[in-house]
Amino acid sequence: MAKTPMRVAVTGAAGQICYSLLFRIANGDMLGKDQPVILQLLEIPNEKAQKALQGVMMEIDDCAFPLLAGMTAHADPMTAFKDADVALLVGARPRGPGMERKDLLEANAQIFTVQGKAIDAVASRNIKVLVVGNPANTNAYIAMKSAPSLPAKNFTAMLRLDHNRALSQIAAKTGKPVSSIEKLFVWGNHSPTMYADYRYAQIDGASVKDMINDDAWNRDTFLPTVGKRGAAIIDARGVSSAASAANAAIDHIHDWVLGTAGKWTTMGIPSDGSYGIPEGVIFGFPVTTENGEYKIVQGLSIDAFSQERINVTLNELLEEQNGVQHLLG
């Protein structure tokens, strides 16, 4: 019996990240190889963006994906999010030359307020929302606060890129395959302040911390490399990391919908007060997922260094959150 198609709304659909993302969604990489999808693609209502979106859709058509059950272009969030089961909020205002962080937060607050309200009004009540557009945690917070009729837990931010970056650095350091690393995760904000934590990580049952056994490497090499990886890629390629961000978005939704089979991963989610993170702050936590629900991994001890790092990333998030509070009505 063929499954009912799932409606996937994607914003910023003519942008760089989506050029890597949409083809993989249509190919079944995100929701499974037996799950048909309908793509509902939102772009800003200017002629150039809408024309570019038509071009992307022509290419998607030309792939003749068996799982693609439909595809529509939109300039209005109210139609783009109609009955959506999954929403990937990729489009965001990038930081322009001479733009203060405060200006960036305000510009994005407008976008994510409008989108949050539209999701609240027309999307499926079980919608799963992932915010990719930066500042992702705070944009997710704005969307969540703009959708009061939906459960807060439906709104998440992408920490999976930091998580995957951390995995690849640990694999390189230990000489072990990425697939053998378990119980690694990331705390906090998707920003250079994030704290990738391998104190509990294991490779084939052995402790990664004991294998590496180098606090200076953790502090001076590993954490800065993961935290500043985005900047390093811009420096090398001249453009921001789009394909790896798209891949992380696929991973995040895949694991949320299809489950992690007991394995730990990282999601930016509204805090329930765990680990002293104030309730409602969108924060990176170690989670497991099952039957479309995520659960924070509990009972981990936090040493002094970890607490210090968690406090830094939390304070940054609280500052961002306070900076947009007046825009949330």
Curated annotation (Swiss-Prot):
<feature type="binding site">
    <location>
        <position position="95"/>
    </location>
    <ligand>
        <name>substrate</name>
    </ligand>
</feature>
<feature type="active site" description="Proton acceptor">
    <location>
        <position position="190"/>
    </location>
</feature>
<protein>
    <recommendedName>
        <fullName>Malate dehydrogenase</fullName>
        <ecNumber>1.1.1.37</ecNumber>
    </recommendedName>
</protein>
<keyword id="KW-0560">Oxidoreductase</keyword>
<keyword id="KW-0816">Tricarboxylic acid cycle</keyword>
<dbReference type="InterPro" id="IPR022383">
    <property type="entry name" value="Lactate/malate_DH_C"/>
</dbReference>
<dbReference type="InterPro" id="IPR010945">
    <property type="entry name" value="Malate_DH_type2"/>
</dbReference>
<keyword id="KW-0520">NAD</keyword>
<dbReference type="GO" id="GO:0006099">
    <property type="term" value="P:tricarboxylic acid cycle"/>
</dbReference>
<dbReference type="GO" id="GO:0006108">
    <property type="term" value="P:malate metabolic process"/>
</dbReference>
<dbReference type="InterPro" id="IPR036291">
    <property type="entry name" value="NAD(P)-bd_dom_sf"/>
</dbReference>
<comment type="similarity">
    <text>Belongs to the LDH/MDH superfamily. MDH type 2 family.</text>
</comment>
<comment type="subunit">
    <text>Homodimer.</text>
</comment>
<dbReference type="Pfam" id="PF00056">
    <property type="entry name" value="Ldh_1_N"/>
</dbReference>
<feature type="binding site">
    <location>
        <position position="101"/>
    </location>
    <ligand>
        <name>substrate</name>
    </ligand>
</feature>
<dbReference type="InterPro" id="IPR001557">
    <property type="entry name" value="L-lactate/malate_DH"/>
</dbReference>
<feature type="binding site">
    <location>
        <position position="165"/>
    </location>
    <ligand>
        <name>substrate</name>
    </ligand>
</feature>
<feature type="binding site">
    <location>
        <position position="108"/>
    </location>
    <ligand>
        <name>NAD(+)</name>
    </ligand>
</feature>
<comment type="function">
    <text>Catalyzes the reversible oxidation of malate to oxaloacetate.</text>
</comment>
<feature type="binding site">
    <location>
        <position position="134"/>
    </location>
    <ligand>
        <name>substrate</name>
    </ligand>
</feature>
<feature type="binding site">
    <location>
        <position position="115"/>
    </location>
    <ligand>
        <name>NAD(+)</name>
    </ligand>
</feature>
<dbReference type="InterPro" id="IPR001236">
    <property type="entry name" value="Lactate/malate_DH_N"/>
</dbReference>
<feature type="binding site">
    <location>
        <begin position="12"/>
        <end position="18"/>
    </location>
    <ligand>
        <name>NAD(+)</name>
    </ligand>
</feature>
<dbReference type="GO" id="GO:0030060">
    <property type="term" value="F:L-malate dehydrogenase (NAD+) activity"/>
</dbReference>
<dbReference type="InterPro" id="IPR015955">
    <property type="entry name" value="Lactate_DH/Glyco_Ohase_4_C"/>
</dbReference>
<dbReference type="Pfam" id="PF02866">
    <property type="entry name" value="Ldh_1_C"/>
</dbReference>
<feature type="binding site">
    <location>
        <begin position="132"/>
        <end position="134"/>
    </location>
    <ligand>
        <name>NAD(+)</name>
    </ligand>
</feature>
